[in-house]
Amino acid sequence: MRVAILYICTGKYTVFFKEFYESFEKNFLPDIEKTYFVYTDRKKLPYSDKKNVCLIPQKNLGWPDNTLMRFALFSREEERFKDYDYTFFINANFLCVKTVTAEEFLPVKENLLVAEHASAHGKNPKDMTYDRNPKCRAFVDWDEGSVYVMGGLNGGKTGAYLDMIHTLRDRVDADKKDGIIALWHDESQLNRYIIG
């Protein structure tokens, strides 16, 4: 089994990669082959000489495009990881501080995995910060949604994940053509997709 980890570190976010890599190598799916696909504006990073680290040149797009355009970045390079069993995007500033096993983490019956946003836990769905703009493709109506998910950790079986990033890339592109940016960028688009 092989797992692809998609990681964006441009600009100031490059400082996180060393600790990220060390913690994920030690604790995240320790018995499974992992490859880190690192989108970066640097020619070299700590551990970039490792066989399981693949640097992908990516200029710093600035705010909010560094997050908003991630689905386009991933789909542009999908040939690199399309044959992996699972693919996950994980935020640059995450650390894996305890052992996480395949049995605990990898979706088996489901195709995708997302994580509830800590700030939304236990909230009434009407109080969650879904995008409420009906012109936006991330729009969530007031009677929809029950859990608000974070944009910083998502993935699953690679085929299903690629389907998701293609859909979200297309929605973001269509919104941009209409002069619209979702409230919380990629996270708003992800929430709309997960709700259905």
Task: Describe the role of every protein-language-model region.
Residues 37, 54-56, 88-90, 112-114, ...:
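Hydrophobic/aromatic beta-strand patches that form the interior of the parallel beta-sheet core
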Residues 130-146:
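Short, flexible, basic/aromatic active-site loop/helix in glycosyltransferases
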Residues 58-90, 183-193:
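A conserved donor-nucleotide-binding helix/loop in the catalytic core
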Residues 1-66, 77-83:
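N-terminal anchoring/stem segment of glycosyltransferases
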Residues 122-132, 148-152:
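Conserved core of the sugar-phosphate nucleotidyltransferase
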Residues 71-124:
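GT-A fold catalytic core of metal-dependent nucleotide-sugar glycosyltransferases
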Residues 142-196:
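Catalytic core and acceptor-binding pocket of nucleotide-sugar-dependent glycosyltransferases
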